[in-house]
Amino acid sequence: MTPRAPSILSQWRELREWPPLETNALHVWRLSWSAWDEAALTSAAAYLTDEEFAQAEHMQMAAVKQRFIATRSSLRRILAGYLAGGEYAAPETARALCLQSGAHGKPALVPPRVRFNLTHTDENCLIAVAAHAEVGIDMEAVTRQRPLERIVRRFFSPAEQAALSGLAGDALTSAFYRIWTRKEAVIKALGEGLACPLHSFDVSADGEARLLAFRRPEIDVGAWRMLNVDVSPDYATAVAVRGPVESVSGYTFTPHQHP
């Protein structure tokens, strides 16, 4: 019987040696913006391409610039580490990686030797990596400030709307964000953006993340794997993988990890 990964990622390990990325493994890397001071950002800039550095220099808001440098340099270091055979990569190796955005904006490594996706909020960034299967990840701050009912009517499927009926208060808010992050993760894994209508498929509203139905015959629901990611009670996070997942690992990435 094929091993089945846990349905939730809740443990984060400090990196002591580079983890091997097995065929059906999923790795999720967590970055905390608070760990990036001015010295760390200066060092991180060495991993950016000339184009990325110029892009950062044109950003007017300091917080946006800092997050861009931290995210893009960490992404390059993480991907280069896998491709280097489990070792920290030098800046020139990380800079040499070709990252491109698809027709609907999904970033990818060219050629696609590993697959990845990322999401961020005001406090954290998560980078999901898989060896061969397309992956999508989404993280949202849980708040009641959004017009939840209007979003549900416009974007959720009839089955999802039915799952939310009768809920109110915190129960409704929690279920809404479970559905929303799971749907976003599926869309990001597909790489189609809103060209794939959000109401064209159903995800679960309860604690276990599942893709329940897809109204496109070419998509095999049974081939997908979904799981929750526990970042903090203030965030809802989900990962969708278009393929089998036999193991899940979470790692904390800091700017002080050096080759």
What are these regions (language model features)?
Residues 1-259:
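Core catalytic alpha/beta fold that binds nucleotide/phospho-ligands
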